[in-house]
A protein has these predicted regions:
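Membrane-interface interhelical linkers
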Residues: 1-11, 28-30, 42-72, 82-91, ...
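Hydrophobic/aromatic positions within or immediately flanking transmembrane alpha-helices
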Residues: 9, 36-37, 71, 98-101, ...
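Hydrophobic/small/kink-forming positions within alpha-helical transmembrane segments
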Residues: 13, 17, 21, 48, ...
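Juxtamembrane helix-loop-helix junctions in multi-pass membrane proteins
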Residues: 18-42
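Hydrophobic/aromatic residues within transmembrane alpha-helices
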Residues: 26, 35, 88, 114-116
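Helix-helix packing/entry segments at the starts of transmembrane helices
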Residues: 34-41, 83, 89-109
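Hydrophobic transmembrane alpha-helices of multi-pass small-molecule transport proteins
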Residues: 47, 123-140
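C-terminal transmembrane-helix exit sites in multi-pass transporters
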Residues: 106-124
């Protein structure tokens, strides 16, 4: 069960849901960029502690330049995403911000097809369309 991608994806979704709630509460009284920096520091320490307890330190030296570059770019994209997300949480309701943030799924599907040459089928198109529709329905606030 712990070797299943679905198990890990569901755990990720659960933790991401908690993240939105904790972040909304945490960003209430401070600058959103400072809140992001604090969160990032916690993530850095926490993930290094886990990685170093499970992976030999010597394996870090074996990482290729290409891998470092791609992970570095991923880190920059993550940082930019978090900065935007925390600002959105500071300005909006979690129940509206989180669905829009999850449009990242649609962007990832499209980019996977364009950059990674993954083949998309009708399920990707239908699912992506439903995600967009769902995000818009959840984020839309009718005029009072």
């Amino acid at each position: 069960m712990l070797n299943s991608w679905l198990t890990w994806a569901l755990l990720s979704a659960r933790f991401a849901g908690l993240t939105a709630i904790f972040a909304k509460i945490g960003v209430a009284d401070i600058n959103s960029h400072l809140a992001t920096a604090i969160r990032t520091t916690v993530v850095l320490v926490f993930t290094w502690a886990i990685a170093l307890s499970l992976v030999p330190l010597a394996s870090v030296a074996a990482i290729s330049r290409h891998t470092w570059l791609m992970l570095g770019l991923s880190g920059v994209a993550t940082g930019l995403s978090w900065l935007c997300y925390f600002r959105a949480l500071q300005l909006g309701e979690v129940s509206r911000v989180a669905p829009i943030d999850k449009l990242s799924v649609v962007f990832a599907i499209v980019l996977a097809a364009v950059i990674l040459r993954e083949r998309l089928n009708w399920q990707h198109w239908l699912g992506g369309s439903l995600i967009v529709a769902g995000a818009l329905v959840l984020a839309w606030k009718p005029a009072a």
